[in-house]
Amino acid sequence: MSDEHLAASPGPVDAFDAHGAPVLRRRSEVPGPLLAVLAYVVAYLVLRLGEHGGLERDEAEMVYLARDLRPGYGAQPPLYTWLQWLAFQAFGPDRFALALVKGLSLGAIYMAMYRAALPWVGRAGALAAAASLLLLPQIGWEALRIQTHSVLMMALACGLLWAYGALLARPVAARYAAFGLVAGLGLLAKYNFAILLGGMVGASLLVHEHRVVLWHRRAWIAALVAMVVFLPHAAWMAQHLDAAFGGTLHKMQDGGEHAPYLRRVLHGALGLLSALAAFVAVPAAAFAFAAWSVRADLASRVRTRARDARMARARDGAAGRFFLWLYVLCLAQLGLLVLLGVVGTIKERWLMPVLFSLPLALLVWLPALRRQAPGGRLLRIGAVAGVATLALLPARIWLGPAIGKTVAAHYPYAPLAQALAQRYPGAQAVVANDVMLAGNLLFARAEAPSLQTVAQTVLLDDLLRERRPLRGEVLLVTQDGYPQGLGADFRAAYPAARPLSRARIELPLRFGGRGMLGFTVERMMLPAPGPAPVRAQPALAQAPGPS
């Protein structure tokens, strides 16, 4: 094999198997990527520990939910919440525990993608594929900024691709079990992981070279392990359908559930096209720039001996068809949801389990990009993007107000918790109608022991759904900009509740934020012992943000 061909081949191989899969040599260079990922994670942790102020919605939700272990928590699967609970048990409900779980999940994304790509495109290509994930805005930026469940889902999606490649190389029982384990954990991380899983299973059946290797009796091992992992949560879902799917369906319909069918389909189709364009724009531009130096080779294979060329075509042909079918099947599932009128729009983040592997697929389809020069160029572009997004993470707090942007760190949740503790020392419960407010009040109390009170903090929806008994003084707190009128819903569920007062608390935004933020506090009194609430339809809180 010529040196030129080696540059375009998947990297360090001893041989190719009968199905075109490369047999890799052991390399001692893996610590390099590992050290880079560790540096990225450590930098993220340091920056997060330097932050102050309110938490974004998803992390506030973790503070609220991860106080105990349950088989299910609501509209999102429980795996991330379980991991957050473990971190809280080890380190306490603080910013470090929040950042640690996300930081490790972020690191797992890039390390798993590197290992997944290695047998497909070699070391240079694998480094480029992993670094190129930083060019996907939903992974490189939004995952840093606000997401939780989606970050873990992406790590497991990369892990599933890694497990799939390992199965192709050696389809033994242990690797089928590993594939099933990752599949089950992925479903416990985010429900839309099922789109990727369905697409991967379908693609493996449609590519002959993969089907003959993977589909035999051992495949039941993977299915069985996945079912065992997911079964406890599935049982919870069957008993709590409204809690598991009500909020998700409302979010998918984007407020258009009463719109005519054709309008829903049109909006969904336009949303899908818009999300696709936004998702691929940045990596497409980066790959076009990297490919410019090898543009003459993109239309044809590098000249090699005939036998080597046949092996390369067999290998790359099967891999290329696998990724092509993967995207066709995943997008077909989203298209079906659009045609059924289930979705009012398609959010860009919903495409994460569908298109996360696009950089790797481009490297498979365009072998010339695996060379040292274009691969190194992609690696440098990804590194610059990673450093830039890390720098923007704290900078957005101070630069945001200059362009009229307010972030969660500006919100005065800690001063609000202090004001409530001082003004209402006898309150037994604080009821909020939004998880961002509830979680941040809990977090403010955890960070400041002087604010510890006997008052429990609870979401109104949970209060109504679980029929919790209450007694004594209860505060209904609503943040400006969110649905108001908790009092009517609360009194419908607790007829014995007696209104005492209604007050406004205006607090200045913090850390450079401009303006004031208002909160409404309704004070209620319930006789002791508190009556069990009557059944009431839970109030519809604002749909949860990205996770």
Give residue spans per PLM region:
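Short helix- or helix-capping micro-motifs
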Residues: V37-Y40, A129-Q138, A183, L187
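Membrane-interface alpha helices of multi-pass inner-membrane proteins
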Residues: D68, A129, R175-Y191, G202, ...
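Hydrophobic/aromatic-rich transmembrane helices and adjacent perimembrane loops
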Residues: L69, R321, W325, L331, ...
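Transmembrane-helix motifs of polytopic, lipid-linked glycan transferases
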Residues: L100-W120, G159-L160
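Short acidic/glycine- and proline-prone juxtamembrane loop motifs at membrane-interface regions
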Residues: L144-S150
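Membrane-interface transmembrane helices that cradle and orient dolichyl/undecaprenyl
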Residues: L160-A178
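Transmembrane-lumen/periplasm boundary regions of multi-pass, lipid-linked membrane glycan transferases
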Residues: L197-G320, C330
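Membrane-proximal, lumen/periplasm-facing interface regions of secretory-pathway glyco-
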Residues: G341-E348, R370-G426, V435-L459, V477-T520
